[in-house]
Design a protein with these regions (language model features):
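N-terminal pre-domain/capping segments
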Residues: 1-94, 100-101
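Histidine-acidic metal/acid-base catalytic patches
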Residues: 2-6, 18, 22-29, 78, ...
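Active-site beta-loop-alpha junctions enriched in small/polar residues
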Residues: 13-17, 39-43, 72-74, 112-114, ...
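Active-site acidic/histidine proton-transfer and metal-coordination neighborhood
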Residues: 20-22, 81-181, 235
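Hydrophobic "anchor" residues on beta-strands that sit immediately upstream
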Residues: 33, 66, 154, 181, ...
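Short, flexible/disordered intra-domain loops and linkers
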Residues: 45-48, 119, 123-125, 223-224
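Alpha-helix-loop-beta-strand connector modules within alpha/beta enzyme cores
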Residues: 53-74, 136-150, 177, 234-238
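Short acidic/His/Gly/Ser-rich catalytic and metal-binding motifs that mark active-site loops
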Residues: 76, 115-120, 218-219
Length: 270
């Protein structure tokens, strides 16, 4: 196994070029990383009930790496259609069962913005219009997390392009729970112009996880860049991760970008 890069546990995302669990684990160990974030948007991991727990545990022992879980980005436990909502909530339950059985410390998810209507002169978010109903379903998600996760697993909400007003209320509710925390995607934050700084200040004690990659300021299409190819102060982000005892996924999209980022980290002494 290659020497660890820094004090922070660093991980890799699931890559299309190495999507299998064993292929990912072997690459992770080769690069000197500590974990793989399995992505449920991929068919191999879409239904956590059908993921082989024994295999994941065996890979953990074989390669000396562990796994975290990234829920389907479309997951929406607040959908107005109860069939859809219940399916997504059941997916969350199954994901938490998997996390317990495969010793996954992090289950990462997005807050789905939901549907919006474009009206003359404005855009109307339905979750904003039906805020109370939306927050009721958020509370259902909170309870699922509290019932399904133990003290070794955190459900972490990731920032994307800026939390909406009703989502900030949702975070106020979720962050009251010991089982819920925050993922800071530093590239998303940078490319969105730091619109979510207030959230991470208010809930500063809830940071549990980080997605680390370079980006260009205020350019959403230039977000998941290899470290050193944007204008983000990723060294400061790593210092934050160390200070807060967070794990960090080097969340780039290709194998070459991952190798380049690992090389940059090693050359920087991090």
């Amino acid at each position: 196994m290659t020497e660890k890069i820094c004090a922070v546990d660093l991980g890799m995302p699931t890559l299309l070029e190495a999507a299998g669990a064993e292929e990912s684990a072997a690459l992770c160990a080769e690069l000197g990383l500590q974990f793989v974030e399995l992505n449920m948007n991929l068919p191999e991991y879409a239904d956590p009930a059908h993921m082989d727990r024994e295999k994941l545990c065996a890979l953990r022992e074989k390669y000396g790496v562990y796994f975290t879980l990234h829920l389907d980005e479309r997951l929406d436990g607040c959908d107005f259609n109860p069939l859809v909502r219940n399916a997504y909530q059941e997916t969350l339950r199954r994901a938490l069962e998997l996390a317990q059985e495969a010793e996954m410390p992090i289950v990462n998810l997005h807050l789905n913005h939901g549907v919006y209507f474009t009206l003359p002169g404005k855009k109307t978010d339905l979750y904003a219009e039906r805020r109370e109903e939306y927050l009721q379903h958020i509370d259902e998600m909170r309870r699922i997390g509290e019932e399904g996760a133990d003290e070794n697993t955190a459900l972490c909400v990731e920032n994307t392009d800026g939390f909406l007003a009703q989502e900030k209320k949702a975070l106020d509710l979720l962050m009251k729970s010991k089982r819920w925390g925050l993922t800071l995607d530093v590239g998303h934050m940078h490319s969105a112009g730091y619109v979510d700084d207030d959230v991470y200040i208010v809930h500063s004690g809830k940071l549990r996880h980080m997605h680390l990659h370079d980006a260009l300021l205020m350019q959403a299409g230039q977000c998941h860049l290899p470290l050193g190819e944007g204008n983000l102060d990723w060294r400061d982000s790593l210092r934050t991760a160390e200070m807060r005892h967070c794990r960090a996924v080097i969340e780039v999209k290709t194998l070459s970008a991952l190798r380049d980022s690992v090389k940059t980290l090693r050359e920087a002494g991090k």
